[in-house]
Design a protein with these regions (language model features):
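A short secondary-structure junction signal
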Residues: 91-93, 113-115, 175-178
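Mg2+-dependent phosphoryl-transfer enzymes with acidic/Ser/Thr/Gly-rich catalytic loops
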Residues: 13, 158-263
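Alpha-helical substrate-recognition element adjacent to the catalytic core
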Residues: 1-111, 205-207
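Conserved Lys-Pro-Asp/Glu-containing loop-to-beta segment of HAD-superfamily phosphomonoesterases
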Residues: 127-171
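A polyampholytic, Gly/Pro-enriched intrinsically disordered region
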Residues: 116-136, 231-238
């Protein structure tokens, strides 16, 4: 076998020498190196590798807690993964059932059940297409025509203003910038090893907030996420009231109201 550093050295060198997308390079390297060493690179094998993932504090019950909080605000919360890692490994992590959809790199498996080709590649910039998929409610990656078709804003399933993007590195920057540009919220979490880089994201206006990667109840991260959900719920209620009044005005049905006067 190889240490992680040795594997990435091989994959990165192969990608550089062949002017290849870095993620496709590492997926190809996995297939080739497993073939050379007689390792069955099957879906089950990769899923089993995911069982060794150590989750950040509080992640295991984060989803049920924030979902329950959303219900108190009249909000239904959905969770998605956009990752440059392997979908199969994420599926083995123990929390994959919490996600409505997982968008991550994935292999195609041949008749022998072995990985033979990259099925999906989620790199730095094409992560944004999956945000659009969530926005429009077109989750099937094979439906490119439907994704690119024009859709009125009021027909889009999840407005950008109702999205929170949580990331931890440079591969998330395009989506973070997209969130901020379209009225959503961008949040970065950090460990000691990447704190400086995450602080730079905040300093350069690429994210709204940064927090230690601690999802436990009562942490500043947890409290801020709840405040953002509250804000989104209030904004939706105000927007709906505005639309109701406009519709009533068009029908000549707007009731007499006492308003606040500015002076």
């Amino acid at each position: 076998g190889y240490t992680p550093d040795e594997f990435w050295s091989i994959a990165n060198r192969f990608g550089f020498e062949n002017r290849m997308d870095g993620l496709l390079a590492y997926m190809y390297t996995m297939i080739e190196e497993c073939r050379k060493k007689g390792i069955r690179l099957s879906r089950d094998y990769l899923v089993s590798c995911g069982r060794a993932i150590e989750l950040f504090p509080g992640v295991s019950d984060w989803f049920s807690r924030i979902n329950a909080f959303g219900e108190t605000q009249g909000v239904e919360i959905e969770h998605y993964v956009l990752s440059s890692g392997l979908r199969e490994i994420i599926e083995g992590s123990g929390v994959s059932h919490e996600f409505k959809e997982i968008y991550a790199c994935e292999f195609f498996y041949n008749e022998q059940g072995l990985a033979s080709w990259p099925k999906l590649d989620v790199n730095f910039t094409n992560k944004t297409q999956f945000v659009y998929r969530i926005n429009k409610g077109i989750l099937d990656v094979a439906k490119d025509k439907e994704l690119n078709a024009s859709m009125p804003d009021d027909s889009k399933r999840i407005p950008f203003t109702n999205m929170i993007y949580i990331g931890d590195g440079l591969s998330d920057v395009p989506c973070m910038k997209m969130m901020r540009a379209y009225g959503g919220q961008a949040v970065a979490v950090y460990q000691d090893s990447n704190r400086a880089g995450v602080e730079d994201l905040l300093a350069k206006g690429r994210v709204d907030f940064i927090f230690p990667a601690d999802y436990r109840d009562g942490t500043l991260f947890d409290t801020t996420m709840k405040n953002i959900v509250r804000k989104m719920a209030i904004a939706d209620a105000l927007a709906e009231e505005n639309q109701q009044q406009l519709r009533a005005l068009g029908r000549g049905e707007l009731p007499q109201q006492m308003g606040l006067l500015g002076w």
